[in-house]
Curated annotation (Swiss-Prot):
PANTHER family with a match to the protein in the record: GLYCEROL-3-PHOSPHATE DEHYDROGENASE (PTHR11728), GLYCEROL-3-PHOSPHATE DEHYDROGENASE [NAD(+)] 2, CHLOROPLASTIC (PTHR11728:SF1)
Any single Gene Ontology cellular-component annotation: cytosol
Pfam families membership: NAD_Gly3P_dh_C, NAD_Gly3P_dh_N
Homology family: Belongs to the NAD-dependent glycerol-3-phosphate dehydrogenase family.
Protein name per its UniProtKB record: Glycerol-3-phosphate dehydrogenase [NAD(P)+]
Primary gene name: gpsA
Length: 329
């Protein structure tokens, strides 16, 4: 593939890591942040000390705070902002020429819509889109360690171009057309990672964590099937792959947040200690609302949502789950 200009909108750890990957394989990459001071610091230090310290930028990775210019200069636009900022970004930018891809995992907090629905409302239902998801920690991608991702799209030509853009010796990209399933996996797994963190914070051990992952996967799958997703998506990289990674490794900020809650650290202090957006906290209420609308039981997600809203404490949430009526698996 000829080398392209990429606009990466969002300079958190994940957006920065993917920007570094794209720049390392030869694409000119514009890394946008809304904060001019953050941009100046990245330009001065040729790295992102706030979110991905210790990993230098390639020369062709250029920080910027000019959102419109980044989009206008780019051959391809990728969004990597938190889910609560996604709608604001797509409403500000001009329509990208090729299509729009995103790394964001979550749903819109205001409308409870999938991010693909927001984009369809803004740019049209036939506008090419792609969602990139899967088991991937930022530092490992930035360090060129082997990673496999799922790329779901509504347009085969655009999907092929995005595949060529990302695919390299260190990143293997699998293709999907299940936009609903891939997006739901990315949103729900963060809530389940909080649950696993809480369980470990309470000292409950490996058995409890395995049960949460397994029953959490069942919840995720039920919700997806009710919305038209395919079951095999939940058994793939975007589903069980990302779920296991996020629930078991302390690089996951959602899991670390749960660990703190399990150790009785107050929610505001836990968020402060994490220092970055905890998507599972922001998306728990939205996922529960979507589940209620679709008449799907998601008891683990419901207990995490209740805990986050101060209705139950960690031990009580566990007791509520363990005392549920017996049922077939």
């Amino acid at each position: 593939m000829n080398k392209k200009t990429i606009a990466m909108l969002g300079a958190g750890s994940w957006g920065t890591a993917v920007a570094i990957h794209l720049a390392k394989i030869g694409h000119k990459t514009l890394l946008w942040s809304h904060n001019p001071q953050h941009v100046a610091l990245m330009a001065e230090q040729h790295s992102n000390p706030a979110y991905l310290p210790g990993i230098p930028f390639p020369e062709n990775l250029i920080p910027s705070d000019d959102l419109i210019e980044c989009v206008q200069l780019a051959d391809y636009v990728i969004i990597a902002v938190p889910s609560h900022a996604f709608a604001e970004i797509i409403n500000k930018i001009p329509k990208p020429t090729q299509g729009l891809a995103w790394l964001t995992k979550g749903v819109d907090p205001a409308s409870h819509q999938l991010l693909s629905q927001l984009v369809a409302s803004r740019f049209g239902v036939d506008f090419p889109i792609a969602v990139i998801s899967g088991p991937s920690f930022a530092k490992e991608v930035a360090r060129f360690l082997p990673t496999a991702l799922t790329l779901a799209s509504n347009n085969t030509n655009y999907q092929k171009k995005m595949h060529q853009l990302f695919h390299h010796d260190n990143i293997r990209v699998y293709l999907s057309d299940d936009l609903i399933g891939v997006q739901l996996c990315g949103a729900v797994k963060n809530i389940l990672a909080i649950a696993c963190g809480i369980s470990d914070g309470l000292g409950y051990g490996a058995n409890a964590k395995a049960a949460l992952i397994t029953r959490g996967l069942a919840e995720m799958t039920r919700l997806g099937l009710s919305m038209g997703a395919r079951q095999d998506t939940f058994l793939g990289l975007a589903g069980v792959g990302d779920l296991v990674l996020t629930c078991t490794d302390d690089q996951s900020r959602n899991r670390r947040f749960g660990l703190l809650l399990g150790r009785e650290v107050p929610i505001p202090e836990a968020e402060h200690q994490i220092g970055q957006v905890v998507e599972g906290k922001h998306n728990a209420a939205q996922i529960c609302a979507i589940a209620n609308k679709n008449k799907v039981e998601m008891p683990i997600c419901e207990q995490i949502n209740a805990l986050l809203h101060g209705i139950v404490h960690a031990q009580q949430a566990v007791n509520n789950l363990m005392s549920r009526p017996a049922k077939e698996e």
